């Protein structure tokens, strides 16, 4: 009986440890800052702050389910930001058309990543790392390192606008999360993505077009970067050639931390959202406690290390 109890506790800890950890850090900050942490305005602030991260993480989740990685997340976000800014400011294009072209460009960059990985056969780490340098180089060459400003006022709706008192970026985040969740769990593409990540050889033997689905997973990631770029540029009201670069590590952390939730070490959308919340709550709570920005990275690093450790345990038990 004791063995069963210990086994049950251990299984629960590895399966739902991320959710429990999220609840614990919320409780800790609620105790440390009882008059500010759980205020509605602060909750909205956290959701607003993680909106870009969650959207980038959603796209990256699809790629990582296949067992691959996309290291161009930050570079692509920066590049699409500059593209949209250039279309609106340098070419006088309509805001909505510029955003649509930006999303299409994000999909194209994702397709290029997918093609190099799936069809040319370059390892995903090397392929996306190299592509990231290329994207960043072209981005810096076009802007010469200078941001694009004087954006149309209407463009601010994505990053600063609100509907019924809730920021538009939060609506965009939840719509993206729901759409990707449905795609992964209710469509043939989603089933194929999970099959490829589970056992690529078996997926290929069962008739799944592995190369096509890999390419499409990177397309989804690229589109997520484009949507994140729209919110980021709108919020800053400027398009900086390196504005999205800082999101690379946080996006990876979000997916890795989320992989320990709900699906035994596999990346999943619900987990990614929890991962984004953990990163957001840590940043917000530590800021409320007057912890320096640099020290916050120590906390994030510890959380990522813990998450990867739990994920490794989960995967070894599955084997």
Q: At which residue positions do the language-model features occur?
A:
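Hydrophobic core segments of alpha-helical transmembrane domains in multi-pass membrane transport
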Residues: 18-30, 59-61, 132-137, 172-183, ...
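Transmembrane alpha-helical segments in multi-pass inner-membrane proteins
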Residues: 225, 235-301
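Single transmembrane alpha-helix segments in multi-pass membrane proteins
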Residues: 24-91, 116-121, 253, 257-269, ...
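Inter-helical junctions in multi-pass inner-membrane proteins, predominant
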Residues: 35-45, 139-142, 184, 188-190, ...
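Helix-loop-helix "hairpin" substructures at the membrane interface of multi-pass membrane proteins
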Residues: 93-99, 108-113, 117, 164-239
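Cytosolic-side transmembrane-helix boundaries in multi-pass membrane proteins
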Residues: 1-27, 204-212, 284-319
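Transmembrane helix-bundle core of multi-pass membrane transporters
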Residues: 120, 124-186, 213-216, 235-244, ...
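Short loop segments and helix-boundary regions at transmembrane helix junctions
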Residues: 4-12, 69, 90, 107-148, ...
């Amino acid at each position: 009986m004791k063995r069963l109890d210990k086994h049950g506790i251990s299984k629960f800890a590895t399966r739902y440890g991320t959710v429990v950890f999220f609840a614990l850090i919320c409780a800790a900050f609620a105790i440390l800052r009882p008059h500010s942490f759980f205020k509605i305005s602060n909750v909205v602030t956290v959701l607003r702050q993680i909106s870009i991260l969650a959207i980038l993480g959603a796209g990256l989740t699809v790629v990582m389910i296949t067992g691959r990685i996309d290291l161009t997340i930050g570079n692509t976000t920066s590049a699409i930001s500059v593209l949209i800014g250039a279309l609106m400011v340098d070419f006088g294009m309509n805001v909505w058309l510029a955003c649509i072209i930006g999303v299409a460009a994000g999909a194209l960059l994702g397709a290029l990543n997918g093609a190099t990985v799936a069809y040319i056969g370059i390892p995903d780490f090397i392929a996306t790392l190299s592509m990231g340098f290329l994207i960043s180089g072209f981005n810096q060459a076009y802007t010469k390192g200078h941001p694009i400003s004087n954006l149309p006022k209407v463009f601010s709706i994505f990053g600063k606008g609100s509907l019924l008192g809730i920021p538009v970026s939060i609506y965009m985040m939840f719509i993206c999360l729901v759409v990707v969740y449905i795609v992964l769990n209710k469509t043939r593409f989603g089933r194929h993505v999970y099959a490829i990540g589970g056992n690529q050889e078996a997926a290929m033997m069962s008739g799944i077009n592995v190369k096509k689905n890999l390419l499409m997973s990177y397309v989804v990631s690229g589109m997520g970067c484009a949507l994140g770029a729209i919110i980021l540029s709108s919020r800053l009201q400027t398009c900086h050639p390196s504005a999205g670069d800082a999101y690379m590590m946080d996006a990876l952390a979000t997916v890795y931390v989320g992989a320990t939730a709900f699906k035994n070490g596999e990346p999943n959308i619900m987990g990614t959202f929890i991962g984004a919340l953990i990163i957001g709550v840590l940043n917000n709570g530590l800021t409320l406690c007057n912890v320096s920005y640099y020290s916050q990275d120590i906390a994030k690093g510890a959380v990522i290390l813990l998450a990867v450790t739990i994920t490794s345990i989960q995967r070894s038990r599955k084997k």
